Amino acid sequence: QLGLNTCWVAVSYKKIKTAYMLDAGEKLCIVIAIGYGKTQGVPHKSKAPSEVADMGDVPEWFKKGVEAALLAPTAVNQQKFFFSLDNGRVSARAGRGFYSKIDLGIAKCHFELGAGKENFNWA
């Protein structure tokens, strides 16, 4: 644990035009802030693994992937994603809502880190 505070921001960063630079053809969707805050942040509330994945008879690597995905930052901590396993292939889908596809990408990255990319293929 490094004691870092992290947050991704999708709207308010536009208020400070000098906070970022874009080249021609680039579009900014989100900004991730990482650093040591003036006050220590608090862990976000998290859903149970069974709320975001089919957790029946699954291997340990899948469980670790889901646990890692639950640590991923999501819009308003909604965790609107769902993982399932079928014949060694992992499916991930986004729920409804603003930024849910961005949330899904971040959750999938966390899933890969927790599960070990060598253990599965994406469906």
Segments from the language model and where they lie:
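Acidic, surface-exposed loops and disordered segments
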Residues: 1-123
